[in-house]
Amino acid sequence: MHVPFVNLTIQFAELEEELVQAFRRIGHTGQYIMGPEVEAFEAALANLCETKHAITVGNGTDALELILRGYNIGKSDEVITAPNSFIASAGAISAVGATPVFVDVQDDLNLDPKLLLKAIGPKTKAIIPVHLTGNPADMDAILSIAKLHNLKVIEDAAQAIGAKYKGKMVGSLGHAAAFSLHPLKNFHLLGDAGFISTNDDDLANTIKKLQNHGLINR
């Protein structure tokens, strides 16, 4: 018997009428890029993550890359991350010209804080802990080490939307977080998408410019 890996048509059938109504509503506005629907969605995401800002982007990889660019991380810099994540975690680091440095994981499959100190060097600029399968990394330890070495902490929360760490929402713990809304994620859109959550006003303003070629309100 063939068992499909995933069958999104079942969910589509359940939501078809709502999706058609939404398509018509947006279609009649003539505003297919950004606009009030996206602004309302971003506000809801910020509320969910308990952050000041949520900025929608093309996908989770874009989210990571834009955060790195927003913090001017690039050529000759190093960024620490976990080796057992999807290739996008390291790929986003490479895309900005930086070098991914892998630190092994502990039994919960998340970045092992005890190994972080050995990996931090003069070129290290950030740590990207990956909250694998919705299980948050040991953020208290990671944030403490990052603060000691003046490093940015960028949460890879692609699989962890809605998760909590000691009562606090994933996405609100580090300097910024990247989320994926890919159809195979636990919370997804009809197509591919992602978003960034942050409480950093300067970063949010920079990403909003990077998000659309420097254009504002267009």
Where are each of the predicted segments found?
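Structured loop/turn residues at beta-strand edges in well-structured enzyme cores
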Residues: 49, 74, 122, 171-172, ...
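Active-site region of PLP-dependent enzymes
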Residues: 160-166, 173-218
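PLP-dependent aminotransferase-like
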Residues: 69-157, 164
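N-terminal "arm"/small-domain region of PLP-dependent enzymes with the aminotransferase-like
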Residues: 1-31
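Phosphate-binding glycine-rich loop
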Residues: 31-78, 92-96, 101-103, 168
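PLP-dependent aminotransferase class I/II
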Residues: 9, 21, 36-44, 48-54, ...
